[in-house]
Amino acid sequence: MIELKGKPVADDIKERAIKRVEELRSQGIIPKIATIRVGDDPGDIAYEHGICSRAEEMGIDIKQKVFAGNISQERLLAKIAAYNEDQDIHGVLIFRPLPKQFDDKTICKALDFRKDVDGITTGSMAGVFTGSGEGFPPCTAEACIRMLDYYGYDLTGKKVTVFGRSLVIGKPVTVMALDRNATVTICHSRTTPEVLREAGKNADVLITAVGRANFLTRDLTGEDQIILDVGINDDGAGGICGDVDPQAASAAAAASPVPGGVGSVTTAVLMEHVVTAAARSALQEK
């Protein structure tokens, strides 16, 4: 089994983006991302640290805002509005899921889609589903496609099965695979066991984003498949694991590990989106 590691993919994206950052800085444009975190979720904090490190490596400025977990929705909306108006900020990332007192749709709708570098707004989603190129796709969904591209897997004519139908990964990665001329089946919580097994065994590429440890067992997979594991789960021993059972992964032709796979590409894609947003902003100002 070939291990599809994320680091070389992330490094390739980073190197290309750094050249663009240098070009923008030579024009007096400094790419900048603002992050908004509500509360002290350990996962959010870890992701935030990763963003800070990556931004520093790439010459991207970052502005961090942390709110207590009990703030009102009005305060959060006010901060988003301020960042929408700040011309020095090119991208805004809101750590989600938010605490229960927030209406997620209202928060996402409040963000200017031109600064939506993680694809959470309807404007960005429309760009993904119509192929208009407006906004940005969700970073993790794009990371899946970028990994396949980097390792030379052409999806043209291939059968792809996606496990999970969220707006963050499942639905957008389905559309992005279709755009690369794949035939895509999407499975979800209401898919019958028989259909689930058939869809898993008959695919050339499997992408799983269910969020359940060992979900994708060997009896759901076929032979000589490519598996991208997007799941991040508690392994019960203080670490993390993906959705793919080890036996299923070892039987694949190639599979991404967790950790060290798709997740490590996500932050690089996010930074690339910030750079692109900065370049677009510069063109609009001319």
Regions found by a protein language model. Name each.
Residues 97, 209-212, 231-232:
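Short glycine-/small-residue-rich Rossmann-like dinucleotide-binding loops
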Residues 38-52, 135-226, 238-248:
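Glycine-rich phosphate/diphosphate-binding loop of Rossmann-like nucleotide-binding domains
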Residues 30-39:
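Short beta-strand segments enriched in small/hydrophobic residues
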Residues 91-155, 197:
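Anion-binding alpha/beta catalytic cores of soluble intermediary-metabolism enzymes, centered on
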Residues 75-87:
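Short, well-structured alpha-helical segments in soluble
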Residues 55-69, 184-187:
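Short beta-strand elements in bilobed, periplasmic/extracellular small-molecule ligand-binding domains
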Residues 105-125, 228-282:
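Rossmann-fold NAD(P)-binding glycine/threonine-rich loop
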Residues 1-29:
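Positively charged, low-complexity intrinsically disordered leader regions
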